[in-house]
Amino acid sequence: DYVTVKGFSPLRKA
């Protein structure tokens, strides 16, 4: 999973 407009990196693989 990846978040763009949250608090993580734009290409953060979760």
Swiss-Prot record:
Q: Does the keyword NADP apply?
A: no
Protein location: Secreted
- Superkingdom is Eukaryota
Among its keywords, does the record have Secreted?
yes
**Keywords linked to the UniProt accession:** Secreted
Could you say which tissues express the protein in this record?
Answer: Expressed by the venom gland.
Q: Which GO terms describe its cellular component?
A: extracellular region
Q: What else is known?
A: Both alpha- and beta-scoliidines are the two major peptide components of the venom. Cleavage products of these peptides have also been found in the venom but are not shown here.
UniProt lists the family membership as follows: Belongs to the bradykinin-related peptide family.
Please report the name of this protein according to its UniProt entry. Answer: Beta-scoliidine
Organism of origin = Scolia decorata ventralis (Solitary wasp)
The taxonomy runs: Eukaryota, Metazoa, Ecdysozoa, Arthropoda, Hexapoda
